[in-house]
């Protein structure tokens, strides 16, 4: 303001004002310069101080480094490893130098330990250090023990053992005896237990007899596992303790598994045998359930197989009842033990069919009966068709099993038919015999239970026999096994003998009437067959078969030679069978023999004699040549029956 006033008032004062302004500006510049210089000085001072401090720190660091390096070098020289110094140097560089250096440096033993590790890693041999290291490294074997304990877990054990092995291999190589024995024992023990444990797991999956086996291996594996867990303690102690530990665990596992197994087995058995038990109870034909079950086990299998082949033949009563519970199983007849009855129906027909065929020509009544039986059970064609498959299966099985096994198979499948007849028809074999037949036969006999209406069933038997006789000849191939054939002949003889006795036994009047008819027919047949036999039994059989044969199924026909053979064999066998039974039912026997169905009586009643008869029969059957599968079963049965009847008559004479 002053300057402005001055300027405004006195223009002369302008230079003064300018001067003052100039001075002010110069002062400001000087001040700014000083401030800047001061700041720069301060900065420089700070930098210098900083540098000095940094230098001092760096010097200290350098000194420390030198000290550490010197110490490391001294340690390395003392240890006597030139490269060790370099290694230590590396170690220091890697880690905080101060920390590792003093550790390595100060405790010589520790340093030696480090050196030992380096040695082991480098595979440097130092016996003293190695021994000390080995002692120290025994802990790694402890980890192995842990894996061994984990071996029970199996998966962890394997991984841990593998890792421990890989980590400790160098140690083992370098370590003295201690690490090795532990490692070896562990490795040895561990691998065997693993296999055993694996079987145990499998056994657990299939807890059957395997479950028992499982526990045995488990015990062994468990002791090993326990030993592994106890490896820390002396080897001897863990081994001693192992058995106890194993026993405890094994027993517990067994108990639990046993309970489970029992339950599962119980269910399984129920599935298996309930039908037979029910049949046995319903039939109450003096069949022992025990015998049935015991026999069932063996014969049932062949029966089931046969049943499969015979599935075409619908079971008369039992199978029909079973299907609802197991609709799908019907297609799979073998699984159901009940199905054996289906073959039984066919075979029973075959058992009686010889009589009916012989008498059918003479006895129209019987033929009517056969018609009746067909509706009752299944169409004769079904039965014959069923029988051929059955016969084939039995032949194959008999051949494979051999005479001895063939006999059981025959007894299991063919005998049941006879059993059924015995229990329900005048022919009915002795009950004791029926009981003896395998459970399958019992099941079959029981199957007729639905047929149990004695009059219709008996009538059906007589009639169906005539019709099923065609199928029955096929059943003969079924026994085709030599044993089977012989047994069939013997059974036929016994069967023939049985009719009279069975008549008295069986209270069913229709059966008795049928038997009387059969006997009359037999006598007629014997006479006629003796005459015919001289002529041509084969031709007559074919005619009778045509007349009688309801089954259109082509069944293996017996060549005339085979027929003659069969007749001859049957003639020999009937006599033997008669001797066996001690009954003169030869004609009946021959007819049945023609069918070659094994009567359970023979099988059950005469076990000792059966083998012989079966062998002979087996030959006769083989010689007789199971009918080739072309001729109707009726044809075969008629031919066989005719040939056999003459032979039986000749034997009687």
Swiss-Prot record:
<dbReference type="GO" id="GO:0043491">
    <property type="term" value="P:phosphatidylinositol 3-kinase/protein kinase B signal transduction"/>
</dbReference>
<feature type="compositionally biased region" description="Low complexity">
    <location>
        <begin position="519"/>
        <end position="528"/>
    </location>
</feature>
<feature type="compositionally biased region" description="Low complexity">
    <location>
        <begin position="149"/>
        <end position="166"/>
    </location>
</feature>
<comment type="function">
    <text>Activates PI3K and concomitantly recruits the WAVE1 complex to the close vicinity of PI3K and regulates neuronal morphogenesis.</text>
</comment>
<feature type="modified residue" description="Phosphoserine">
    <location>
        <position position="434"/>
    </location>
</feature>
<feature type="modified residue" description="Phosphotyrosine">
    <location>
        <position position="268"/>
    </location>
</feature>
<feature type="compositionally biased region" description="Polar residues">
    <location>
        <begin position="421"/>
        <end position="439"/>
    </location>
</feature>
<protein>
    <recommendedName>
        <fullName>Neuronal tyrosine-phosphorylated phosphoinositide-3-kinase adapter 2</fullName>
    </recommendedName>
</protein>
<keyword id="KW-0597">Phosphoprotein</keyword>
<feature type="region of interest" description="Disordered">
    <location>
        <begin position="373"/>
        <end position="653"/>
    </location>
</feature>
<feature type="modified residue" description="Phosphoserine">
    <location>
        <position position="206"/>
    </location>
</feature>
<feature type="modified residue" description="Phosphoserine">
    <location>
        <position position="120"/>
    </location>
</feature>
<feature type="compositionally biased region" description="Polar residues">
    <location>
        <begin position="634"/>
        <end position="653"/>
    </location>
</feature>
<feature type="compositionally biased region" description="Polar residues">
    <location>
        <begin position="112"/>
        <end position="122"/>
    </location>
</feature>
<feature type="modified residue" description="Omega-N-methylarginine">
    <location>
        <position position="81"/>
    </location>
</feature>
<feature type="compositionally biased region" description="Polar residues">
    <location>
        <begin position="223"/>
        <end position="232"/>
    </location>
</feature>
<dbReference type="GO" id="GO:0048812">
    <property type="term" value="P:neuron projection morphogenesis"/>
</dbReference>
<comment type="similarity">
    <text>Belongs to the NYAP family.</text>
</comment>
<feature type="compositionally biased region" description="Basic and acidic residues">
    <location>
        <begin position="533"/>
        <end position="562"/>
    </location>
</feature>
<feature type="region of interest" description="Disordered">
    <location>
        <begin position="99"/>
        <end position="243"/>
    </location>
</feature>
<feature type="compositionally biased region" description="Low complexity">
    <location>
        <begin position="461"/>
        <end position="481"/>
    </location>
</feature>
<dbReference type="InterPro" id="IPR029353">
    <property type="entry name" value="NYAP_C"/>
</dbReference>
<feature type="compositionally biased region" description="Low complexity">
    <location>
        <begin position="398"/>
        <end position="412"/>
    </location>
</feature>
<dbReference type="Pfam" id="PF15439">
    <property type="entry name" value="NYAP_N"/>
</dbReference>
<dbReference type="InterPro" id="IPR039482">
    <property type="entry name" value="NYAP_N"/>
</dbReference>
<keyword id="KW-0488">Methylation</keyword>
<feature type="region of interest" description="Involved in CYFIP1- and NCKAP1-binding">
    <location>
        <begin position="150"/>
        <end position="161"/>
    </location>
</feature>
<feature type="compositionally biased region" description="Basic and acidic residues">
    <location>
        <begin position="168"/>
        <end position="188"/>
    </location>
</feature>
<dbReference type="Pfam" id="PF15452">
    <property type="entry name" value="NYAP_C"/>
</dbReference>
<dbReference type="InterPro" id="IPR026722">
    <property type="entry name" value="NYAP1/NYAP2"/>
</dbReference>
<feature type="compositionally biased region" description="Polar residues">
    <location>
        <begin position="198"/>
        <end position="208"/>
    </location>
</feature>
<comment type="subunit">
    <text>Interacts with ACOT9, ARHGAP26 and PIK3R2. Interacts with components of the WAVE1 complex, CYFIP1 and NCKAP1; this interaction mediates PI3K-WAVE1 association and actin cytoskeleton remodeling.</text>
</comment>
